[in-house]
Amino acid sequence: LDISHRIIEKSAEFMTQEANFLKNCQHPNIIRLRDYNLEARRPYIVLDYLGNISLKNEIFNGDRRVSIKKTSNILAQICTALSYIHKKGFVYCDIKPSNIMSRRQKYTLIDFGLVRPIGMEITGGTIGYMAPEVLQNDSKNVKASPTLDIYAIGILLYELLTGFHPLASQKIYNNKNSYSFDRQSITDKTSIPSRASDLNPFLPKAFDGILLDCLNKNPKDRYQSMDVLLQNFEKAVARSI
């Protein structure tokens, strides 16, 4: 057991939200809260130290494309963590590569400052991973739902399997480990991402439907649970071998 820790200073609101959620969590793919004091002169939380390599490093510093087998391993770990969160009645609300730490083939969700109870108004997110219904309303009056996390997982899967963000073309990719986004391309219901198999010739077309179901602009037409998404993905993986 690695018992090294790091102390992270955050805004009081996010820190309180994160500590209150993590103190009741026990999952191998969710960062572990070791200690916290929100009443101290300088409030703090103490979390397990997971190194400094995130999934973002693997995407941008590697070949910008991950094998189907490795993607399946990543998805299995993160989907089970998100399913656990949803079954506890919460939505993570900030899935992105930099919030997934990578260490010895283990992938761990970190940064729970935006987690919200299902049905409550969300407080933000990261453009490029926020669902279109959130951007359309500037986060106002948008209720937290598991379909928000499913949309973001669709973005992540697309990046892993193709090396590209589905809503940021190659022309506007920059070399500073980030993308540029046209907000309208995210919210426009007529804007459909390129099929992943068109960008990755080694990717079976069965994965196209899974990704497009995650990325549907209508939340009612997305997968409604992480468990079903994972089952469908694993079936596609089995057929591709």
Feature map (PLM): residue ranges:
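Activation-segment/catalytic-loop signature of the eukaryotic protein kinase fold
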Residues: 36
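Conserved short submotifs of the Hanks-type protein kinase catalytic core
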Residues: 40-54
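AlphaC helix of the protein kinase catalytic domain
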Residues: 55-66
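AlphaC helix of the eukaryotic protein kinase fold
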Residues: 5-24
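Conserved HRD-motif arginine in the catalytic loop of eukaryotic-like protein kinases
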Residues: 222
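Catalytic-loop of the protein kinase fold
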Residues: 86-102
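Activation segment signature within eukaryotic-like protein kinase domains
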Residues: 74-75
